[in-house]
Amino acid sequence: MALPILLDCDPGHDDAIAIVLALASPELDVKAITSSAGNQTPEKTLRNVLRMLTLLNRTDIPVAGGAVKPLMRELIIADNVHGESGLDGPALPEPAFAPQNCTAVELMAKTLRESAEPITIVSTGPQTNVALLLNSHPELHSKIARIVIMGGAMGLGNWTPAAEFNIYVDPEAAEIVFQSGIPVVMAGLDVTHRAQIHVEDTERFRAIGNPVSTIVAELLDFFLEYHKDEKWGFVGAPLHDPCTIAWLLKPELFTTVERWVGVETQGKYTQGMTVVDYYYLTGNKPNATVMVDVDRQGFVDLLADRLKFYA
């Protein structure tokens, strides 16, 4: 039986590819997709969800737009990474359908309420919508199987020296998620920076030759440009968000540890840092499954295999 999931995202090139991977996988049943502000403004990320679902001919999936800003801060966007539209590069279709006439939190709550079994929430942007859901609907916590997030890092940040972008945008929301008591799975930079797509991988995807694999290759062409900066030391581009979906499909590709994670919301230099108690120094019980490594080739092979679904 397919695993029911709710996807909360801020497309974004890697979010878009996470959507492609999820909808090519019969093991997953995507119940709804909600958008968050992050990689671009809330209007643009919502539009990008609709554009991707139009491309994939999945206009049956309910979509709703989420919070327009973080819980307690002004919005920061990553237009330097994802371009003016949030999905610069390929020519994507205009949306062929409209979002639901409700908020992301309302759609999430309705989906959880109507489900006969607990649902996994996959969140690949800032955690604002998920935190609002948890705070406003404590009665639905038992309907959430787990929350799989792309965010954070045990080691180095990518937006500040200490902080990964998604967590930095709304650290208060991330702290609510980690301390919620619901099982959390964290795909942080420690693993996503190992999930790099090389130029030859992009050409492999392009050679699959269907419209969706071609769009994915064109998304990666654009995404690779930002990551060519020598400061990163990358061979290719880290495909952050699809790690969440890949873990659900093939957890054996990933090495994980069970640890306590907290989020720094106050620090002068460390605001947005995910503090991972790797050596059990705090005495706190683990609250997260933290990904620390990935079989890169297996990850690439999974993506290539699933792109053939769109032939």
Swiss-Prot record:
<dbReference type="InterPro" id="IPR001910">
    <property type="entry name" value="Inosine/uridine_hydrolase_dom"/>
</dbReference>
<dbReference type="GO" id="GO:0008477">
    <property type="term" value="F:purine nucleosidase activity"/>
</dbReference>
<dbReference type="InterPro" id="IPR023186">
    <property type="entry name" value="IUNH"/>
</dbReference>
<comment type="similarity">
    <text>Belongs to the IUNH family. RihA subfamily.</text>
</comment>
<dbReference type="InterPro" id="IPR022975">
    <property type="entry name" value="Pyrim_hydro_RihA"/>
</dbReference>
<dbReference type="GO" id="GO:0006206">
    <property type="term" value="P:pyrimidine nucleobase metabolic process"/>
</dbReference>
<dbReference type="Pfam" id="PF01156">
    <property type="entry name" value="IU_nuc_hydro"/>
</dbReference>
<dbReference type="InterPro" id="IPR036452">
    <property type="entry name" value="Ribo_hydro-like"/>
</dbReference>
<dbReference type="GO" id="GO:0005829">
    <property type="term" value="C:cytosol"/>
</dbReference>
<dbReference type="GO" id="GO:0045437">
    <property type="term" value="F:uridine nucleosidase activity"/>
</dbReference>
<dbReference type="GO" id="GO:0006152">
    <property type="term" value="P:purine nucleoside catabolic process"/>
</dbReference>
<keyword id="KW-0378">Hydrolase</keyword>
<keyword id="KW-0326">Glycosidase</keyword>
<feature type="active site">
    <location>
        <position position="240"/>
    </location>
</feature>
<protein>
    <recommendedName>
        <fullName>Pyrimidine-specific ribonucleoside hydrolase RihA</fullName>
        <ecNumber>3.2.-.-</ecNumber>
    </recommendedName>
</protein>
<comment type="function">
    <text>Hydrolyzes with equal efficiency cytidine or uridine to ribose and cytosine or uracil, respectively.</text>
</comment>
<dbReference type="GO" id="GO:0015949">
    <property type="term" value="P:nucleobase-containing small molecule interconversion"/>
</dbReference>
<dbReference type="InterPro" id="IPR015910">
    <property type="entry name" value="I/U_nuclsd_hydro_CS"/>
</dbReference>
